[in-house]
């Protein structure tokens, strides 16, 4: 079986059925105070050849006029409490709401479709019936500095490729890389592997991609389907982001067991970044080195978060609501009675052993 198949012209040709499939495609965009992006986002979506009722906005109780703008555009809208947003559960709710769709495209509010065929090109990957998911290219914004530009060029090259479970021998965990900033899923494949994990802090798309690869679906990187999407993250924001990724990996050990770690990919990234900065902006090398060290430390901290009090995790993480919910769950699990002064650690319960931890079906344990 081919492990990772590049496509030399940078695209996977969409067949003549793409137009029909486009009409059976739902587009899901979670929003929160998206008004500042709206004009450009709506204009770009208008060029994609999809009708307004194919676009589903899941709004986390924005305090600006996001919902008013979405209603004016004719989009479907569902409002949820801000604190109830979860990366996996919210996207799964959207998938179940769009029961008519054969393909679901997920975007973020700040991902701007590039060109007029990016969605059609993305779903062109599904002309191969063995493809379960596809994700598109992310281009850096015009004002991005060299560090930000390199991150996008490294992770989203100009050449498409197809990944299978065998790709892990060459790519490690990168074989399951996906980004819901611009990704598409065959609904039947998504539901076959259990949908999006409902209780995950981040990386719900990586979990789904990994499950699909294990189930012998293919995952495609579609380079000719692009959005403009990059962020000028501060060091503190990156620290929180990589802490959360570490938490996800620490709580999803099956993922690392099945695909391996990311250490080799990390070394390749650092070498590539150094060469890019030497050529484009050497003055950024010291701050890039510090950022890389910070990301490594925060990832390792997240990987071993079980040793940290929840209050510390709340302070570090980007997703306070995740830890607040976990705190409530653990408090509810306290014994009804106990000795005065008895202390309970607000930490996850020990893993079950033996028959108790065996999944009831092949994907139940892949959380």
Task: Please place each PLM-identified region on the residue numbering.
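Short, flexible, basic/aromatic active-site loop/helix in glycosyltransferases
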Residues: 136, 154-175
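A short, conserved alpha-helix in the catalytic core of glycosyltransferases
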Residues: 183-185, 189-194, 199-226, 232
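A conserved acidic beta->alpha catalytic loop
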Residues: 59-67, 112
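Short, well-formed alpha-helical segments that are part of the catalytic scaffolds
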Residues: 33-47
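Short beta-strand-to-loop acidic/aromatic patch adjacent to the donor-nucleotide binding site
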Residues: 101-112
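Conserved donor NDP-sugar-binding/catalytic core segment of glycosyltransferases
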Residues: 112, 116-148
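Non-catalytic, C-terminal membrane-associated alpha-helical segments of glycosyltransferases
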Residues: 244-247, 258-367
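Glycine-rich, basic loop-to-helix element that forms the pyrophosphate-binding segment
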Residues: 81-99
């Amino acid at each position: 079986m081919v492990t990772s198949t590049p496509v030399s012209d940078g695209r996977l040709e969409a067949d003549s059925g793409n137009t029909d499939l486009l009409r059976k495609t739902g587009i899901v965009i979670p929003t929160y105070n998206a008004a500042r992006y709206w004009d450009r986002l709506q204009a770009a979506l208008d060029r994609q050849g999809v009708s307004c009722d194919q676009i589903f906005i899941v709004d986390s109780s924005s305090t600006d006029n996001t919902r008013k703008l979405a209603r004016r555009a004719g989009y479907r809208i569902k409002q949820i409490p801000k604190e109830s947003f979860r990366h996996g559960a919210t996207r799964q709710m959207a998938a179940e709401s769009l029961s008519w769709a054969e393909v679901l495209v997920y975007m973020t509010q700040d991902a701007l479709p590039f060109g007029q065929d990016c969605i059609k090109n993305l779903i062109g990957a599904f002309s191969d019936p063995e493809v379960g998911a596809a994700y598109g290219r992310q281009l850096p914004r015009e004002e991005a500095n060299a560090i930000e530009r390199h991150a996008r060029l490294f992770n989203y090259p100009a050449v498409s490729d197809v990944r299978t479970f065998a790709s892990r021998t060459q790519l490690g965990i990168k074989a399951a890389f996906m980004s819901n900033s611009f990704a598409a899923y065959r609904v039947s494949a998504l539901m076959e592997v259990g949908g999006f994990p409902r209780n995950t802090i981040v990386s719900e798309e990586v979990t789904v991609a990994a499950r699909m690869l294990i189930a012998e679906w293919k995952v495609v990187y579609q380079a000719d389907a692009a959005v403009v999407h990059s962020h000028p993250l501060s060091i503190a924001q990156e620290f929180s982001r990589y802490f959360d990724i570490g938490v996800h990996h620490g709580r999803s050990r099956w993922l690392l067991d099945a695909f391996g770690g990311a250490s080799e990919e990390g070394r390749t990234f650092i070498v590539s970044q150094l060469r890019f900065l030497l050529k484009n902006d050497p003055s950024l090398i010291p701050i890039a080195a510090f950022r890389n060290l910070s990301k490594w430390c925060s990832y390792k901290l997240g990987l071993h978060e079980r040793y940290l009090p929840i209050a510390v995790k709340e302070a570090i993480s980007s997703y306070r609501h995740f830890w607040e919910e976990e705190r409530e769950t653990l408090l509810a699990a306290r014994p009804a009675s106990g000795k005065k002064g008895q202390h309970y650690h607000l930490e996850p319960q020990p893993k079950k052993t033996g028959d108790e931890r065996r999944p009831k079906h092949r994907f139940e344990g892949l959380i």
